Amino acid sequence: AERNLLAENVPADHIFVTGNTVIDALHHTVRQDYVFPAEFSDLDFQSHRILLVTTHRRENLGEPMRHVYQALRQLAEEFPDIAVVFPVHRNPKVREVVRQELGDVPRVHLIDPLDYEPFANLMARSTLILTDSGGVQEEGPALGKPVLVLRETTERPEAVAAGTVKLIGTAEANVYEEARHLLTDDAAYRAMSEACNPYGDGQAARRIVEAIRCRYGFLDHGPERFEA
């Protein structure tokens, strides 16, 4: 964003790099003492590593999604210590394929879409996230969770460059191998989970307020720059 503004001849001293306020909201929402809704009553966070899955994008409808779900079936069958939690999009085309491929698989929890608060707290308690969502690519890494992106391209290339997310597409073999790699290789897992999130550190709102106060003369200096 800063490069784009500079390319448009916005003066550098008019630009404040603050990070994204979505990360602030995330940190305010996630709580250690959060109590999950009733649909989580049969989910054991202590005994299972949680794989959180979301899929909804139109380009993945049909066979691409089916391949993803077949890979999830393999993972659930191979790793008895994982539980797959899948808030299923309400699109009937998504639900039909999900039920066909995962409806009878032990430790695969197919639930209705979640509001932001339970979803954010579920991300915080997950081991690994597989998604074709955009926002999750920012939020998951802020919680130290590797994110495997079920797409060929992303509008968030900074996350790929930072190593917090990885584009893996929807091919069954690739989804299976990439997820399995992170579930079995501690060093690979740490490399992603400990990479610096390029989208914020939870202090964006404070920096924005300080920038505004500086602009109107209430402070004699702007906020420190957010650096990923």
Tell me what each language-model feature is:
Residues T184-A228:
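C-terminal amphipathic helix plus adjacent low-complexity
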Residues F16-V17, H109-D112, K166-A171:
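Short acidic-hydrophobic, aromatic-tinged amphipathic segments that line or gate anion-handling sites
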Residues A1-E63, I168, A188:
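A nucleotide-sugar donor-handling region in carbohydrate enzymes
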Residues Q32-R125:
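Donor-nucleotide binding loops and adjacent catalytic segments primarily
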Residues P113-Y116, E152-E155, E172-A173:
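Short, acidic/turn-prone active-site loops that include or flank metal/cofactor-
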Residues N121-V160:
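A donor-sugar binding/catalytic signature common to diverse glycosyltransferases
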